[in-house]
Amino acid sequence: RIIEPIAGGPFIVMTWNYPGTIGIIAVDANGHIAVGTSTN
């Protein structure tokens, strides 16, 4: 599993890459969370 936390501006973004799946979690300064996944 590959996890890359990226801090920039008001957002903290974490991406991970499973076999055939890419996921993204984004958290803003207010604690709102956005999650995205895609299967290739």
UniProtKB/Swiss-Prot annotation:
Post-translational modifications reported in the UniProt record: May be N-glycosylated.
Cellular localization per UniProt: Secreted
GO biological process: proteolysis
Catalyzed chemical reaction(s): N(4)-(beta-N-acetyl-D-glucosaminyl)-L-asparagine + H2O = N-acetyl-beta-D-glucosaminylamine + L-aspartate + H(+)
Keyword tags: Autocatalytic cleavage, Glycoprotein, Hydrolase, Protease, Secreted
Active site: T21 (nucleophile)
Tissue spec: Expressed by the venom gland.
GO molecular function: N4-(beta-N-acetylglucosaminyl)-L-asparaginase activity; peptidase activity
EC number(s) reported in the record: 3.5.1.26
Subunit structure: Heterotetramer of two alpha and two beta chains arranged as a dimer of alpha/beta heterodimers.
Name of the protein described by the UniProt record: N(4)-(beta-N-acetylglucosaminyl)-L-asparaginase
